[in-house]
């Protein structure tokens, strides 16, 4: 069941759902709006191949702290960004992340993203550029997070490799290799 603004406020008031900072316009009719943080990472323009079975991306990402001047997302560029807000999900809520329609109308896109029950941290989002450069700014509301209650609290809440992340978190490889299946 998707939570209404009333239900969301109850979760927040009871400190079952943490959103920090929480602004007056965060809670919406059927979800919460989250803002750009001040960190953006783009992939360097290189011809080297990133091997997802063994390579990290530290050597192919350029990360920036952005202030009032904003950040330009180039045409069809893939960037990583983060939410300003730190969130903590209870064991009976999941989040369905959507780009706010204003940013979609500029041609930006995010892939489907789910926030698992029990997740704690800033949310790192993959953002794909439009056909024209688009400038965005820290503090702008850019995501709409729909909250859905599970039929019961999950047996195994999220404890994965992105638990507790702060700021942009690049991909982390699994310990097991897909080459050995």
From Swiss-Prot:
Q: Gene3D superfamilies from the entry?
A: 2.70.40.10
GO terms in the biological process aspect are: dUMP biosynthetic process; dUTP biosynthetic process
Q: Which residues bind dCTP?
A: 100-105, 116, 158, 165
Catalytic residues per the record?
126
Xref: Pfam families = DCD (PF22769)
Molecular function via GO: dCTP deaminase activity; nucleotide binding
From what superkingdom does this record's organism come? Archaea
Q: Any idea of its EC number?
A: 3.5.4.13
Q: Does the entry feature the keyword Nucleotide-binding, yes or no?
A: yes
Q: What residue spans carry the region label Disordered?
A: 160-181
Which keywords annotate this record? Hydrolase, Nucleotide metabolism, Nucleotide-binding
Family under the similarity heading: Belongs to the dCTP deaminase family.
Cite the NCBIfam families for this sequence: dCTP_deam
Query: Quaternary structure?
Result: Homotrimer.
UniProt-recorded name of the protein:
dCTP deaminase
Q: Which organism is it from?
A: Desulfurococcus amylolyticus (strain DSM 18924 / JCM 16383 / VKM B-2413 / 1221n) (Desulfurococcus kamchatkensis)
> What gene makes this protein?
dcd
């Amino acid at each position: 069941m998707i939570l209404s603004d009333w239900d969301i406020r109850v979760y927040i008031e009871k400190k079952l759902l943490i959103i920090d900072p929480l602004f007056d316009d965060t809670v919406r009719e059927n979800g919460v709006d989250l803002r750009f943080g001040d960190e953006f990472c783009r992939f360097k323009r290189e011809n080297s191949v990133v091997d997802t079975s063994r390579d990290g991306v530290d050597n192919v990402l350029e990360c920036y702290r952005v202030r009032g001047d904003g950040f330009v997302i180039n045409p069809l560029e893939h960037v990583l960004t983060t939410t300003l807000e730190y969130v903590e999900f209870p064991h009976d809520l999941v989040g369905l992340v959507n780009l706010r329609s204003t940013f979609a109308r500029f041609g930006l896109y995010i892939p489907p993203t789910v926030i698992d029950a029990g997740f704690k941290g800033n949310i790192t989002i993959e953002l794909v550029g439009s056909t024209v450069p688009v400038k965005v700014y820290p503090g702008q509301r850019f995501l709409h997070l729909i909250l859905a209650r599970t039929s019961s609290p999950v047996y195994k809440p999220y404890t994965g490799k992105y638990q507790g992340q702060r700021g942009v978190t690049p991909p982390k490889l699994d310990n097991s290799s897909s080459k050995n299946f």
